[in-house]
Amino acid sequence: MSAEQEKKTQGTTKEEQKSSFASEDVASKQTEEAKAVFGDGVAKQENKSGASTNDEKKPAEGDEDAEPASPEVHFEPIVKLSAVETKTNEEEETVEFKMRAKLFRFDKAASEWKERGTGDARLLKHKETGKTRLVMRRDKTLKVCANHLLMPEMKLTPNVGSDRSWVWTVAADVSEGEPTAETFAIRFANSENANLFKENFEKYQEENAKILKKN
């Protein structure tokens, strides 16, 4: 290579270096201007790789699961309800007799006996009038399945083929609200209980007959 060509080559190299340094100065100047206007975050986004830097803020562990503590809230009722006393219409009566039994009702339409309920058959005597009625409630639900006065015309008759059950007819049973004529059959655990029921039934039936006769 001649001396003249070497000079040309060296001149070209110096020009390229100047151009490169000038480009770097321009880029640096633009970065500084961006920092001044938008802050350091914008300048970082102008990195050639475009990747996020390690200086980016990371969420603290457990922040997503953390819940702000709330104080316990207590609400007072706007309207205070007073206790309501439930009445059974038996408050003015005394229990003269009680025996567990199962009650049946004769369904005329189907011409068959249907179970009415299981519970305590009770003879309740009113404190003022002195009249006695038969009241029986179903277990658990306490729904009334028999409710009528022991009238003089009623007659207990043995159920066919059983020594522990009785059958009788009622002109006005009010267990369903409205008075209805019913035929009942009541069955006890044994004949002794059945006979005790019959004795007390007829005893208070006679007392009712005397009271009704006076009236």
UniProtKB/Swiss-Prot annotation:
Extract the ranges annotated as region (Disordered).
Answer: 1-78
Residue positions, PTM Phosphoserine: 70
Q: Which InterPro entries match?
A: PH-like_dom_sf, Ran_bind_dom, RanBP1-like, RanBP1_RanBD
MF terms (GO), sorted A to Z: GTP binding; GTPase activator activity
GO BP of this protein: protein import into nucleus; Ran protein signal transduction; RNA export from nucleus
| Entry keywords, A to Z | Cytoplasm, GTPase activation, Phosphoprotein
- What family classification does the UniProt entry report for this protein? Belongs to the RANBP1 family.
Q: What does the protein in this record do?
A: Stimulates the GTPase activity in the presence of RNA1. May potentiate the action of RanGAP1 (RNA1), thus playing the role of a negative regulator.
Q: By what name is this protein known? A: Ran-specific GTPase-activating protein 1
Species per Swiss-Prot/TrEMBL record: Schizosaccharomyces pombe (strain 972 / ATCC 24843)
